[in-house]
């Protein structure tokens, strides 16, 4: 029988408003059974050999040599001696290195991070610890302070080991190995929260030995730009690989543990993106979700575990999964609560907050795709392997904004038999490349030395940077602050690399005439049209009085990558603000935040919060297929994201925020565009916002606009904090009023 003949489209729990319910064979409903206590056979041998044959992703060291950054703290350097042999205790040395990196930091969380004010004195602000290859034994938790990044390097990643039966990890109380923390000046140390920015673990491995049942490899957390990237976590018989979550978890493999990730709502209620990750051999579930974790999961594989995802009782979830693979998941891919069973489910907003999307996924040796815990209803997948073209649970609004608009709730499944390795590999193939090899990097500081110049001292550094990018393909920018009086223009193949965007700033000269004319916008950093670039690890600050300034003009073509980039953090506000919050003492003038003109590629972990710009992300005149992962745009007066004449763009994990005085700001505006996807979005309005807005996403003269999943329900001043509608056609005035939905498709 052909695969097309095996295709099944199924909808459970009826349809409303013109939708037709289908139930075509193959959709089984059975009593719920307990999860298997023994994981399905995990492909351990294949993993030991580098990965199963269906996996195209290389997991190895992303920094094979030491990055040439003199401002970073070197573990093993003077004052931070280590054993590095897996025998001696290196805990104290690593803690001291983290403390020193934090002390060196150039950004104070009580200044331009928390409030947006520029006049607070600097304090512990963050930095980088570089860790060479080796095996480092730890005997207790290591706090990763706000805006500190621990970055490994070498042909083999450094490995941090919690030895067998380490005291303190078998007491019945969970205990961390690495803990993301916030340490404000003069305040108490706490776990990372919504005032924590830029912390990270990058390019290192963590191994938990036997006899540590309460160990957690990483207690993650933070508000923006926080990062777990290029990690292998061997959790063994420990409690969890990762507990709590923040912005981006990228190229992370977790083996073993009771659960791989114990997920919560990230700080301030944002989503978390899991990108190119692998979970294998968890005893209970790969991902256990508590209070609406809002996960966006892309190109991630789950192997040899009873459940890929499970929700805590009485909790709704916003779960979006795309281009992922399930191998030997023995109980069910996703275990969710029945929406009708949720406390308060008589409220449509609460019931519809329970959302699942599986899109473009594959499965082998995995029978059930969805289990609804209270009713026991199971949605079966094709055997022995199959394609999950689309499976949703929740409200679907199809043919939206037109005369054929329809609504239905429940389970919808479109699956087909057969998932050959070639198809699995194609789905998992990444578009987010690792950084260029370190041996190809040329430090801009070395170019300055060749020119007899000093940079980062408050004078104009533009000619040194321009010489560096003109002469070299990959230019490294050390930690520091660098002043420009005009645009730094990259060549067709330039890469510009930093290690930490909160500690590596390119700054516009305040009040300079080159950035003064709003009718002739001029960028601080610009890429040429159609080029191929990697730009990462940088902060872009257009100062204060630069009415024509643009933080970044991105015209790069397919295959380009913009990642781990931030603008200055300032919030728009009116002149008559009564608040004493220092965040509203700053007044600026800027044109755009990030301006994409004819370009695209891939973007990840980007934070555009220059609130005095007209918008945070303006995309114009492009049909370059582009995916954006975990992009945050906040605090502007009237527009956050604007798309004009754009095709083939996908936003996976878009977050916007309207603050107290920014209540007139629209989340997304789309004009004369087509084939746009917004998936797993959090279009947020703070509890103190001072007025309503009629809709979140406005479209005009556009086709095939798709919204998949959205957090819209707020129980605090809902007349202001909830959008008047999710989607509006600004030409006809027609709207889709539901702000909680699994699918809206025009």
Predicted regions and their residues:
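Classical protein tyrosine phosphatase
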Residues: 148-149, 153, 485-487, 491-499, ...
């Amino acid at each position: 029988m052909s695969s097309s003949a095996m295709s099944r489209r199924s909808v459970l729990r009826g349809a409303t408003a013109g939708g037709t319910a289908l139930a075509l064979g193959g959709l089984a409903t059975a009593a719920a059974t307990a999860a298997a206590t023994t994981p399905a056979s995990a492909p351990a041998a294949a993993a030991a050999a580098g990965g199963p044959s269906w996996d195209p992703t290389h997991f190895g060291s992303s920094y094979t040599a030491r990055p040439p950054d003199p401002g970073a703290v070197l573990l093993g350097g003077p004052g931070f001696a280590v054993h590095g042999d897996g025998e001696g205790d290196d805990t104290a040395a690593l803690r001291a290195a983290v403390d020193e990196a934090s002390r060196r930091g150039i950004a104070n969380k009580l200044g331009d991070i928390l409030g947006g004010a520029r006049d607070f004195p600097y304090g512990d602000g963050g930095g980088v610890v570089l860790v060479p290859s080796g095996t480092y034994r730890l005997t207790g938790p290591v706090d990763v302070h706000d805006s500190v990044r621990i970055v490994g390097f070498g042909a083999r990643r450094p490995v941090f080991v919690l030895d067998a039966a380490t005291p303190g990890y078998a007491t019945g109380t969970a205990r961390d190995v690495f803990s993301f923390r916030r340490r404000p000046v003069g305040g108490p140390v706490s776990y990372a929260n919504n005032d924590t920015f830029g912390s990270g673990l990058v390019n290192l491995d963590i191994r938990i030995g036997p006899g540590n049942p309460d160990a957690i490899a990483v207690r993650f957390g933070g508000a923006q730009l926080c990062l777990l990237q290029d990690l292998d976590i061997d959790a063994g018989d420990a409690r969890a690989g990762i507990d709590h979550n923040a912005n981006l978890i990228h190229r992370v493999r977790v083996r073993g543990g009771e659960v791989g990730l114990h997920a919560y709502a990230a700080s301030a209620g944002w989503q978390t993106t899991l990108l190119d990750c692998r979970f294998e051999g968890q005893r209970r579930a790969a991902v256990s979700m508590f209070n609406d974790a809002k996960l966006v999961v892309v190109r991630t594989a789950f192997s040899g575990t009873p459940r890929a995802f499970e929700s805590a009782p009485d909790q709704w979830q916003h779960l979006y999964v795309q281009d992922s693979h399930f191998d030997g998941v023995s109980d069910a891919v996703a275990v969710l609560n029945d929406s009708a069973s949720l406390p308060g489910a008589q409220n449509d907003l609460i019931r519809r907050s329970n959302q699942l999307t599986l899109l473009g996924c594959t499965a082998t040796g995995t029978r059930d795709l969805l289990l609804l815990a209270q009713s026991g209803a199971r949605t079966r997948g094709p055997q022995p392997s199959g394609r999950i073209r689309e499976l949703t649970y929740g409200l679907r609004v199809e043919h939206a904004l037109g005369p054929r608009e329809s609504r239905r709730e429940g389970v919808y499944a479109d699956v087909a038999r057969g998932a050959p390795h070639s198809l699995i590999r194609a789905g998992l193939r990444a578009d987010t490349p690792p950084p260029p090899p370190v041996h190809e990097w040329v430090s801009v500081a070395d170019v300055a030395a060749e020119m007899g110049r000093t940079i980062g001292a408050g004078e104009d550094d533009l000619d040194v940077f321009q010489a560096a990018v003109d002469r070299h393909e990959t230019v490294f920018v050390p930690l520091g602050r660098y002043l420009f009086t005009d645009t730094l223009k990259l060549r067709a193949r330039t890469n510009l690399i930093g290690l930490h965007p909160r500690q590596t700033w390119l700054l516009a000269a305040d009040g300079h005439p080159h950035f003064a004319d709003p009718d002739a916008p001029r960028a601080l950093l610009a890429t040429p049209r159609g080029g191929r670039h990697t730009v990462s690890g940088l902060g872009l600050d257009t100062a204060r009085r630069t009415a024509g300034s643009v933080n970044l003009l991105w015209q790069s073509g397919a295959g380009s990558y913009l990642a781990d980039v931030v603008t200055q953090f300032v919030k728009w506000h009116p002149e008559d603000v009564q608040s004493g919050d220092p965040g509203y003492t700053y007044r600026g003038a800027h044109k755009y935040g990030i301006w994409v003109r004819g370009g695209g590629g891939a973007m990840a972990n980007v934070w555009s919060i220059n609130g005095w710009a007209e918008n945070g992300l303006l995309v114009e005149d492009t049909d370059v297929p582009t995916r954006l992962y975990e992009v945050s745009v906040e605090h502007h007066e009237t527009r956050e994201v604007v798309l004009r004449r754009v095709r083939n763009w996908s936003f996976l994990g878009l977050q916007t925020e309207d603050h107290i005085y920014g209540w007139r700001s629209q989340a997304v505006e789309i004009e004369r565009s087509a084939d746009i996807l917004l998936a797993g979005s959090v279009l947020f309005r703070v509890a103190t916002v001072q007025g309503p807005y009629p809709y979140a996403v406005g479209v005009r003269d556009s086709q095939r606009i798709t919204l998949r999943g959205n957090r819209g329900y707020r129980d605090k001043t809902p007349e202001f904090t909830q959008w008047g509608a999710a989607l509006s056609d600004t030409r006809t005035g027609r709207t889709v009023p539901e702000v909680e939905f699994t699918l809206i498709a025009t």
